[in-house]
Amino acid sequence: MFGFFNRAKKVGKGPTAVTGAQAVRSFGVAEMGRELSPWVFDGGFSNVEIAAALATIRTRSRDMQKNSPQFSQYFRQFKNNVVGRGFTLRAQPCEAVGDPAIDEAAKAFIQYHFWKWSKDRDEVDLTGRKSFARMCRLVAENWARDGEGIILIERNAPTVYGLQLRVVRPDALDEKMNGQGFTANTVIRNGVEIDRRTKRPIAYYFNGTAEDPMAAWYNSKPYVRVPASDVIHIFTQHDECQTRGIPLGHASLKKAKMLDEFDLSELVAARDEANTTGIFHAPADREDEIKKLNEDTAASNYVCQKSEPGTKYVLPPGWDYDPKTPQHPNREVSSFKNSMLRDVASGLGVEYACFANDWAGVSFSSVRAGTLAERDNYTTLQDDFVEMVVAPVFKAWLAQFLTRTIANPYVPSDFARLCEFEFQARTWAWVDPMKDVQADAIAVEHGWKTNEEVTAQYGGSDFKENCARLAEENAAKKQAGILTAPQITKGEKPGKEKDEGEE
């Protein structure tokens, strides 16, 4: 019954009809014609490709941070928007495992001690240089610039809380190390030992030195094997089997570098033309006079003179002077550069105007739309950072904290019920805050948002804590005889007083 599909279509009439060509459905982008022949096959973000290219991309990304104004701005924006002043802990310890009731005493206790630990550089950093917020900013910068951030956890440290952290440069983890793992069930991929079946990280191999007593030799190189439980490794995963990260700006690096070189060439050309005001021409058959003028100090003033306003050149008989009009900087440079920077900003996922510091022709609506898209991207990055860095650090800190006498009356067996938490990342103020505050007030009034959600948007504070503080402030005002400012009703402008008898 399906023989119809096997018959070729006849084109034309009569016995001399010819068989027509059969149409084949296919993706146009998969064609291998002349136009697309330079488009080579790409295997994606495979471990093999990353091992071959990571070191080069990473060093070039670091160079751009040093020498490119735009990329320096991007890395600064990245760490300030992802981390900012740090993350605020919102502990949610329950009375018992499975009980939704919050243990308020334990909540205040845990939040206070974690805040105290995170502010103390000697407690947080093995080097004693960074608080937890500063360490997070450094890790975020490494994540953007090098493609990954790495922290080693030092448990049972000789400190009050027993936990210290150490930031490690990503290039200390050898991306070219591949082979058999520590056991038959593991394999090493780009310096990371993973389980063959689950692909879960088991250990990390860091470059060691021959004098390091903890180093083991592998392929004639010393390495230090660190269990995955003691390593915090953040990177953006583009492939399921990917074990290492690549710089987040990899798609824009090439164009940004070429644009920097173009800028330099344009600047050199402009400077050269600015320094060359004109050219002297000797008459025919008298070119030897140039040599004589160069030998005679007094006469050489004809050839090389200082350019001063209102002065004219006095030339020997027969000589000529050709003034040069600078052609650089080219009038089209600005529009061309802005177009290229838009592509670079798109590859970085940032808003162009702020990235390029170009606010010409920008309207409020366009800034708002671009800012919203950029903040959506940063919000996702904040979630990733909390999930991969901040949350594991807190869990490790809490486990160590409960083993210390400072944690009394809480003990290690309370870990399960106390390890309920969330972290509030930094938020942003709006360009027109009055309208946004009014919109939030309407949302709360109609039940579209809660006071807790709105409070979290403004600095990450806690609504219940705000209520307690407001109660204390109102009591203090009442005791001091200070009247509370009247509330503004709908349709009333700030500062407008009601007339007597007006309701």
Predicted ranges, named:
Residues 231-370, 411:
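Extended, charged amphipathic alpha-helical segments
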Residues 130-153, 329-431, 484-485:
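C-terminal amphipathic alpha-helical
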Residues 110, 337, 341, 470-473:
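Short amphipathic alpha-helical coiled-coil/interface segments
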Residues 153-155, 269-277, 355-359, 452-458, ...:
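Short coil/turn segments at secondary-structure boundaries
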